[in-house]
């Protein structure tokens, strides 16, 4: 079986179809690459692209996409509901077949090094590629977002893994990582009051409440709340990394007594 790697870069552009096409064209120009999915969001002003190929093909396609994004996206003008810190916000590599997580970590390092050296964009390695335990969680790495990046880069504790500590005002910074498949579980609430969504998120999100009185064994998921102006509802979202859909369905069944298969809309790609 041939080695197959998936890359799921997130770009800080979800409204200009011309710019999005320039990025996806740069990916498809790399021989052997299969572009599988393009998911754009106007409120988030963000596009998630999924493509697969051999390790070398994916390495090159990922770098070309980051380079194109750095040319056409100006973070000084970016506005959107989703947390972000760079033109290419995140660029994870996922082992699909006949390749190990360690090899994907190597790919993340190769791409991260090129981004830092050739594009002068600060790079932070996260998840399985993280160089310290404190950088494994993407939410932690992205704390402060683009607006707080200049100050963050001045902190010795946040020296980039690749690239200079100089603030790239146009492109921001990029998080490059290696991880298992991720299931993003989003819940739309039947209310325009964000308070309810915040309360739910505080209880289940990984960073959670500042203080959990009497709760010595809380459960955590990576989560946040995003308010979509177009649809006029708050959206609670949780990320399950390395999980299967069966585990997610079972969790929903236990907590609600209902079958999630009858109540959800699937977007993107099924890891199977």
Could you describe each region identified by the protein language model?
Residues 1-272:
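Long, contiguous binding/interaction regions
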């Amino acid at each position: 079986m041939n080695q197959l790697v998936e890359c799921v870069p997130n770009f800080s552009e979800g409204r200009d179809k011309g710019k999005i096409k320039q990025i996806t064209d740069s990916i498809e120009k790399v021989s052997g690459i299969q572009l599988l999915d393009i998911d754009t969001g106007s409120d988030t002003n963000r596009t998630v692209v999924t493509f697969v190929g051999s390790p070398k093909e994916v390495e090159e396609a990922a770098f070309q996409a980051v380079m194109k994004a750095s040319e056409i996206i100006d973070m000084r003008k970016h506005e959107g509901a989703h947390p972000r810190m760079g033109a290419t916000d995140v660029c994870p590599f996922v082992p699909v077949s006949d390749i190990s997580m360690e090899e994907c970590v190597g790919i993340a390092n190769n791409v991260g090094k090129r981004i830092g050296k050739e594009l002068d964009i600060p790079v932070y390695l996260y998840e399985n590629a993280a160089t310290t335990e404190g950088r494994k969680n993407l939410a932690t790495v992205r704390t402060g977002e683009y607006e707080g990046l200049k100050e963050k880069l001045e902190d010795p504790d946040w020296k980039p893994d690749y690239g200079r500590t100089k603030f790239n005002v146009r492109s921001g910074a990029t998080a490059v990582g290696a991880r298992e498949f991720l299931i993003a579980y989003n819940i739309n609430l039947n209310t325009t009051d964000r308070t309810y969504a915040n309360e739910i998120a505080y209880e289940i999100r990984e960073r959670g409440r500042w203080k959990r009185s009497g709760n010595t064994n809380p459960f955590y998921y990576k989560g946040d709340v995003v308010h979509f102006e177009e649809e006029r509802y708050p959206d609670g979202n949780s990320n399950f990394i390395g999980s299967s859909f069966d585990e997610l369905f079972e969790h929903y069944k236990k907590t609600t007594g209902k079958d999630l298969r009858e109540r959800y809309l699937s977007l993107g790609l099924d890891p199977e």
